[in-house]
Amino acid sequence: MDRLFADGTVNAAETGRGPPLFLFHSLLSDRASFDAIAPKLAQSFRVVVPELPGFGRSRAVAEGFAAIADRMAELVEDAAGGEAAIVLGNGYGGFVALQMALRHPAIATRLVLADAGAAFSEPGRDAFRAMAAAAGARGLPAITEVAMRRLFAPEFQARHPDLMRDRREAFLRTDPEVFRAACGALAELDLRPQLGGLEVPVLVLVGEQDEATPPPMSRELAAMLPNARLAILPGCAHVPQLQAPEVFLAAIGDFLRES
């Protein structure tokens, strides 16, 4: 069931009963990327899957990346209703979750950061600048195949044509200006100086084949956080919860149960 939170600015699907668990989607995908794992998680948690600001029915934020993190903190505070919350972010959603937790230390008791990081390498920053420029000049169709390659390995794409058709359509529904702004923010973002102050337990996951946020980014993130553990998912790329849902659920299960 969809509900509006944060004074009507954030739309989210809500299902299940139990402690609140929030799932933040990536930039190159949408909240449907969690469809394969949400039903299982809803057996133990109240699962809240928002559309990030500027996606779907959620209102865009014009003030930059920190303001997006603040908006999502409003969502978590509103939807959790005072209960201890766990936040899981994939890709861009992981960066948002990390920035949110750094700016609002009491907002979550645990974080799962899947295929994210604290800062991109210079080649990674250049890739975002190039995608933003291409999207501005020729529209999202010009970079759709680049986006899909960043999400899934070619072998996976070849084996799942129907899924890939759905993922391309989802990407093309993204607001181009929201996409360009997010690319610009990620090209400049560097959260590393703040990581030492984040005390909550963090599970850092990454697909071994992830080209969008390669494993060295997750290794660096886990090493710089005071209370983090790292898991590398074999055979997975940037959206492991969609590519290998059972593997992903097994990887996060113990960490979630510890809460």
What would you call each of these model-derived segments?
Residues 8-59:
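Conserved HGGG/HGGXW glycine-rich cap/lid loop of the alpha/beta-hydrolase fold
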Residues 67-84:
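Conserved acidic catalytic loop of the alpha/beta-hydrolase fold
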Residues 89, 93, 97:
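Gly/Ala-rich beta-loop-alpha elbow adjacent to hydrolase catalytic centers
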Residues 98-103, 107-138:
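Flexible "cap/lid" loop of the alpha/beta hydrolase fold
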Residues 122-126, 138-196:
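Conserved alpha/beta-hydrolase catalytic His-Asp/Glu region
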Residues 198, 204-206, 210:
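Short beta-strand/loop motif that positions the catalytic acidic residue
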Residues 219-239:
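Catalytic histidine neighborhood in serine/cysteine hydrolases
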Residues 236-245, 249:
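Catalytic histidine-centered segment of alpha/beta-hydrolase-like enzymes
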